[in-house]
Amino acid sequence: MDPDRQKLIERARELNTSEFPVIELQERIREVCFEYLIEAKVDVDHLLGHEDWRVRSSALDMVWWGVGATDGIAASIEILMHDPDEDIRAEAALALYEAARGTPKETQVREAFRRVSAAAEAPEYLRAAALTYLGKLDHPSGQRRVGPGVGPVSE
């Protein structure tokens, strides 16, 4: 293996065992995604549970790219449903859509999107995002969409 890549993998693995300032965590997470360091086996679930929203946001990129030892789907669903930061919840919706389509986890993600789209306490834009991604999962060709409160409708 290329020594430079090995060094990047070791830096990424430190995300599992060391505490770093938020900026350092974000930089290392970006490296994992940019270099597609799947060999590093980063514990995405641990990063998704971080107290700082910036780390959770960066970790959602790992879910999207599928580069962690843990896939982060369950933790991302938890963020989608309950994170105190509404913007992070919206990011989780996109990451879940990208990570789950065509995988065995798609059923879990569909159910989470259904729950969010029907949750009166969820912000309108989050309900709309959940409906949109649910529609995209249902009709990946883009020929049909899900309309608010009406179910699948033709374009």
Where are these regions (language model features)?
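Secondary-structure boundary/capping motif
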Residues: 9-13, 56-57, 75-76, 89-91, ...
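Structural detector for internal amphipathic alpha-helices that build alpha-solenoid repeat scaffolds
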Residues: 19-36, 46, 57-69, 87-104, ...
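Short coil turns that connect the paired helices of HEAT/ARM alpha-solenoid repeats
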Residues: 14-20, 48-54, 81-87, 118-125, ...
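Acidic, small-residue rich beta-repeat scaffolds with periodic aromatic anchors
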Residues: 123, 132-134, 141-155
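Amphipathic alpha-helical scaffolding segments comprising HEAT/armadillo-like alpha-solenoid repeats
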Residues: 2-13, 35-49, 68-82, 103-117, ...
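N-terminal "cap/leader" segments of large eukaryotic alpha-helical scaffolds
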Residues: 1-29
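A sequence-level detector of short, solvent-exposed, charge-rich linear segments
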Residues: 63, 78-79, 96, 111, ...
